[in-house]
Curated annotation (Swiss-Prot):
GO terms for biological process: methanogenesis, from carbon dioxide; methylation; one-carbon metabolic process. Pathway: One-carbon metabolism; methanogenesis from CO(2); methyl-coenzyme M from 5,10-methylene-5,6,7,8-tetrahydromethanopterin: step 2/2. It is a single-pass membrane protein. It comes from Methanopyrus kandleri (strain AV19 / DSM 6324 / JCM 9639 / NBRC 100938). HAMAP family: MtrG. Belongs to the MtrG family. The gene is mtrG. This is Tetrahydromethanopterin S-methyltransferase subunit G.
Amino acid sequence: MAEEESVPKMVAPEDDIREIHSRLDEIERRLDFVWGEVYQRFGKRIGRDIGILYGLVIGLYLCMLYILLGVAFR
């Protein structure tokens, strides 16, 4: 029979594995913080743009009312 091929195995000390996991956890925590800040800034920018649009629409609506009511009551 042919020899069975096996996947090479490696055994690492537990201390090294714990150290690697702690480093990966720290990197993940930093990435979560950075992406949270990025999305928060993006949300603020979108909110500002929507507020500007609402302000313009309400301003135009008030101008139209002023013009229409001003002409009607002359």
